[in-house]
Amino acid sequence: MAAQRMRDGRPVIWSPQPAQARFMQRTENEVLYGGAAGGGKSDALVIEALRQVEIPHYRGLIIRKTFPQLRELIDKTMRYYKPVFPKARYNGSTHCWTFPSGAKIYFGSMNHAQDRYNYQGQAYDFIGFDELTHFTWEEYSYLLSRNRPNGPDTRVYTRATANPGGIGHGWVKARFVSPAPPGTRMVQMVKARAPDGREIVQRRTRIFIPSTVFDNAALLENDPGYLGTLAALPEAEKKALLYGDWDSFTGQVFTEWKNDPAHYDDQRWTHVIRPFRIPGHWKIWRGYDFGYSKPFSVGWYAADEEGRLYRIRELYGCTGTPNEGIKADPVKQARMIREAEENDPMLRGRTILGVADPAIFNESQGESIAAMQEKSPNFLHWAPGDHTRLAGKMQFHYRLAFQADGRPMLQVFNTCKHFIRTIPNLVYSESNVEDIDTDQEDHIYDECRYVLMENPLSPPRTEPVQPMPDDPLELGKKARFFRV
């Protein structure tokens, strides 16, 4: 906050900086503000919550993942709310501000997924999420259902702030950042069926408003050294927190990951490549992770003469909502897999080696999933995969490491959109710091891990050599691999 100023003979408690003003002027249903540290996100959020406090039945909610994280936000409201509304009262037991009109702003948390049911039956005209990437999609979407009016003439909307990273990084990026350039309104038409059979169509809007420390002149004036603090961070954190880079963030498991369209053809210094014809003598693997309410995942991999694996096709049982399965039973999944292999020229007529989550062989509650899928007419055969988690994670690291020639030992066709979406977004578990967080959308990771464990690599002997930046003959661009 800038030093106190006067306007019309009255003190100015707070005034928005340009990026904050852009955020607060938006009219969409959902707005995400941020992308980097120090942009003044939290200040804008707690001030935005005041917009309707003159309406007696207005109810607002500001939420963080855990309650201790709310302390700073509550301190901000003490600094801002009381001078503007001297008769407003904060109740430390209920964590609620009550304003002279009767309007209320609550502070809440959702430390565990089941905590979302603490808000069951509640209605909030405004919901503000601070650090949205700390929440799962299930938590966010449930609270969206609580975003409804408490009476006439209130505006009903949600606002959120975030930095890259955290368990929710993937879905937040997919919902707000990836679909459109920053500052571009996204429109979604949603449908519902009325009891009389009528189809009701409504319009939902959302937008991402970026912000970095460079947008916070007040902070840089009060603490010029903060810019240096961010610039001195390790590279991944620096990219995320200084520049708001959503492709690099703290806690990312596979920091080796690189998706460079400029090298899709020469296959160097990128894990994503353009599809090519698979030679007939290459071995084909099929990995499988079963899911019902969560997505199931099938990946097909080709192995070349050097032991390099290529993910050439995928089948992902997702509704389009992050981490939500299509609820297909085991036999239907087997039929979908068989149809893919019969219709895809890369797979038709091939001998395919299937490896799957050992859990599908469980017979404790009747016929196993593996047995159901092996029956006529699908005849899918699976071998139980090696479920050793840390060894499997290390195989991922070994495979993703670039060799001296710029080629890794695992590459992915650019048609495998869900692999490309989910693998870079995996973060470490807070309780088991060597493993990934299993509450994420990790189904593709699991089925790939089973295939990697069937084709283990030794640790790379040497660090990869990065290409020389000075390449006047453009030899790197001209190099290309041809398949015969």
Can you describe what each PLM-predicted range is?
Residues 307-437, 456-468, 473-484:
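Mg2+-dependent endonuclease catalytic cores in nucleic-acid-processing enzymes, primarily RNase H-like
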Residues 58-70:
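Conserved RecA-like ASCE P-loop NTPase motor core of nucleic-acid helicases/translocases
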Residues 1-29:
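Pre-P-loop entry segment of helicase/translocase ATPase cores
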Residues 42-56:
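Walker A/P-loop NTP-binding motif
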Residues 215-288:
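ATPase catalytic-site recognition across NTP-hydrolyzing enzymes
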